[in-house]
């Protein structure tokens, strides 16, 4: 999953396309995972919501800083470009927004797990319906054990995991197994 935005890139045209920002983006494994896993989950939830007369949901990706701050940082820009690629390929399923929590901390109040939880400008929030996950920016990168300097980008995998976590939670599945030696009276 982490093919398109890693810093040590195999630049063969078979796997990567250079985009207008100079990054190699839109890797097929990343897009296929979203297309084959998250899209059906979103469609299932939205079909149930439509039957109840409710509005359609999208996966909301919220950056906890002003747009200019996100673009100014090389690290946050990698994450942003990955999310923008998803939005470009799946505009009906992904929305991207920016909340400047330094000036409007109450805008993200509902994403705090407890009243003592802190959110920072380096957080990225993935939301779908009532489910959300808050990720720190450093989660999308690989670092050495004794250093905080990132040496590789692992964002595609973490973005995919976050999106699958919030979309799957809205459509829970229960399984019952029988005939494994238990009594079935």
Language-model segment annotations:
Residues 1-185:
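Short, surface-exposed patches at the edges or C-terminal ends of soluble domains, predominantly
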